[in-house]
Swiss-Prot record:
<protein>
    <recommendedName>
        <fullName>Protein patched homolog 1</fullName>
    </recommendedName>
</protein>
<dbReference type="GO" id="GO:0097108">
    <property type="term" value="F:hedgehog family protein binding"/>
</dbReference>
<feature type="glycosylation site" description="N-linked (GlcNAc...) asparagine">
    <location>
        <position position="177"/>
    </location>
</feature>
<dbReference type="GO" id="GO:0008158">
    <property type="term" value="F:hedgehog receptor activity"/>
</dbReference>
<feature type="topological domain" description="Cytoplasmic">
    <location>
        <begin position="221"/>
        <end position="235"/>
    </location>
</feature>
<dbReference type="GO" id="GO:0005886">
    <property type="term" value="C:plasma membrane"/>
</dbReference>
<feature type="transmembrane region" description="Helical">
    <location>
        <begin position="200"/>
        <end position="220"/>
    </location>
</feature>
<keyword id="KW-0325">Glycoprotein</keyword>
<comment type="function">
    <text>Acts as a receptor for sonic hedgehog (SHH), indian hedgehog (IHH) and desert hedgehog (DHH). Associates with the smoothened protein (SMO) to transduce the hedgehog's proteins signal.</text>
</comment>
<dbReference type="GO" id="GO:0005119">
    <property type="term" value="F:smoothened binding"/>
</dbReference>
<keyword id="KW-0675">Receptor</keyword>
<keyword id="KW-1133">Transmembrane helix</keyword>
<dbReference type="InterPro" id="IPR000731">
    <property type="entry name" value="SSD"/>
</dbReference>
<dbReference type="GO" id="GO:0045879">
    <property type="term" value="P:negative regulation of smoothened signaling pathway"/>
</dbReference>
<feature type="domain" description="SSD">
    <location>
        <begin position="201"/>
        <end position="257"/>
    </location>
</feature>
<keyword id="KW-0812">Transmembrane</keyword>
<comment type="similarity">
    <text>Belongs to the patched family.</text>
</comment>
Length: 257
């Protein structure tokens, strides 16, 4: 709940509402006291199985002052069994629609014979970003983007820049003498990898074909001209080179890069 940003200020409330102390059911009860119709909201929360939100979830630090009194391990002297809690996955705010699988949370797991999680070597975190089209549609019409000729290409550029900056910040967050390793992977990283494998080095390709040509000629060449097949090897290498060139030309013709 502490990782969830956002603060709401309501009339009559001295403290701002945050996820660490927001109880949806208690909030609806307060709305009922001022004769506010909450039937549709109650139905929505019940269908999504929101309940008390994060208020009835275990705290990582039971002695934390912000740990709600409704937490099952409030003021407990024992640390929570995180492995048991994460075994099989865990739930977000909605127990019906926000279930995070165990494979998306931890890695390098060790389990007992019953499949219960005992320990893990890595903690995983995932951020789901908008697609360029979704981001363009979301901010279209905002005054902040009117002066930059807002379009999908600019949205894609912003998403790419954010991912690159995120990777850089993550790598800088770990001290050099730390025993822990932080690995980051984004769609931009995947695109860079694919691009690096797609780039064709003329020197490397030419060197490779020259080596193939020399190998084919030397292995098939004989001193006896009647038994020598060096020309066949030369023709075979040239045929392969022309086939590859034709394939690349066809890909370029149909727009595959």
């Amino acid at each position: 709940a502490k990782l969830q940003t956002g603060t709401a200020y309501l009339p009559g409330k001295h403290a701002p509402l945050q996820w660490t102390q927001f109880d949806p059911l208690e909030f609806l009860e307060e709305l009922k006291k001022i004769n506010y119709q909450t039937d549709s909201w109650e139905e929505l929360l019940n269908k999504a199985e929101v309940g008390q939100g994060y208020m009835n979830r275990p705290c990582l630090n039971p002695t934390d002052p912000e740990c709600p009194v409704t937490a099952p391990n409030k003021n407990s002297t024992k640390p929570p069994d995180v492995a048991l809690i994460l075994s099989g996955g865990c739930y977000g705010l909605s127990k019906k629609y926000m279930r995070w699988q165990e494979e998306l949370i931890v890695g390098g797991t060790v389990k007992n014979s019953n499949g219960t999680l005992l320990r893990a070597q890595a903690l995983q975190t995932m951020f789901q970003l908008m697609t360029p089209k979704q981001m363009y549609e979301h901010f279209r019409g905002y005054e902040d983007v009117l002066h930059i000729n807002w379009n999908e290409d600019k949205a894609a550029a912003i998403l790419e820049a954010w991912q690159r900056m995120y990777v850089e910040v993550v790598h800088q967050s770990v001290p050099q003498n730390s025993t822990q390793k932080v690995l980051s992977f984004t769609t931009t990283t995947l695109d860079d990898i694919l691009k690096s494998f797609s780039d064709i080095s003329v020197i490397r390709v030419a060197s490779g074909y020259l080596l193939m040509l020399a190998y084919a000629c030397l292995t098939m060449l004989r001193w006896d001209c009647a038994k020598s097949q060096g020309a066949v090897g030369l023709a075979g290498v040239l045929l392969v080179a022309l086939s590859v060139a034709a394939g690349l030309g066809l890909c370029s013709l149909i727009g595959i890069s």
